[in-house]
């Protein structure tokens, strides 16, 4: 597994709007295996790490958008508290149309992870993805 650290950060509070769009909503359960909470947990990667999607091309899956809303690529992943006592399965979303740099990830899960894991901005987390 690939493992890397990041810090929880606040986003633009817009992901929930997109998560609720019918064009995406119908595909979440089939492709992610769960219905995601209607927002993302933003994670700023540590130590100038960026995720090179070219190296993970065979692991990426796609949620199809339409003319107004772009496709969303995703990787199945696991997010853990820094002490690794609690791990939650989810996915890292890579919207084709995004405002974030490659060092900020958008993580989704079936739960509101800020509440479930008692996370706040600046808290460190660990993300793991299959190689």
From Swiss-Prot:
Pathway(s) per entry: Cofactor biosynthesis; FMN biosynthesis; FMN from riboflavin (CTP route): step 1/1
SUPFAM superfamilies in UniProt: Riboflavin kinase-like
Enzyme class: transferase
GO biological process, one term: FMN biosynthetic process
GO MF assignments: magnesium ion binding; nucleotide binding; riboflavin kinase activity
EC code: 2.7.1.161
Binding site for Mg(2+): 40, 42
Cofactor details (free text): Binds 1 Mg(2+) ion per subunit.
Residues engaged in binding FMN: 98, 106
Cofactor requirement: Mg(2+)
Record-listed CDP binding positions: 11-16, 111-114
Catalyzed reactions: riboflavin + CTP = CDP + FMN + H(+)
InterPro entries per UniProt: RibK_CTP-dep, Riboflavin_kinase_archaeal, Riboflavin_kinase_CTP-dep, Riboflavin_kinase_dom_sf
UniProtKB keywords: Flavoprotein, FMN, Kinase, Magnesium, Metal-binding, Nucleotide-binding, Transferase
Family designation: Belongs to the archaeal riboflavin kinase family.
Chain's role: Catalyzes the CTP-dependent phosphorylation of riboflavin (vitamin B2) to form flavin mononucleotide (FMN).
Entry protein name: Riboflavin kinase
Species for this entry: Methanosphaera stadtmanae (strain ATCC 43021 / DSM 3091 / JCM 11832 / MCB-3)
Gene responsible for this protein: ribK
């Amino acid at each position: 597994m690939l493992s890397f650290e990041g810090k929880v950060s606040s986003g633009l509070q817009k992901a929930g709007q997109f998560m609720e769009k019918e064009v995406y909503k119908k595909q979440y359960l089939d492709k992610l295996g769960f219905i995601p909470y209607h927002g993302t947990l933003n994670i700023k990667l540590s130590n100038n790490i960026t995720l090179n999607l070219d190296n993970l091309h065979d692991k990426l899956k796609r949620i199809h958008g339409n003319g107004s809303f772009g496709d969303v690529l995703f990787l199945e992943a696991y997010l853990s508290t820094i002490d690794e006592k609690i791990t939650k399965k989810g996915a890292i979303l890579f919207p084709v149309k995004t405002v974030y740099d490659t060092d900020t990830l958008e993580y989704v899960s079936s739960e509101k992870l800020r509440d479930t894991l008692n996370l706040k901005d600046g808290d460190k987390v660990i993300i793991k993805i299959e190689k």
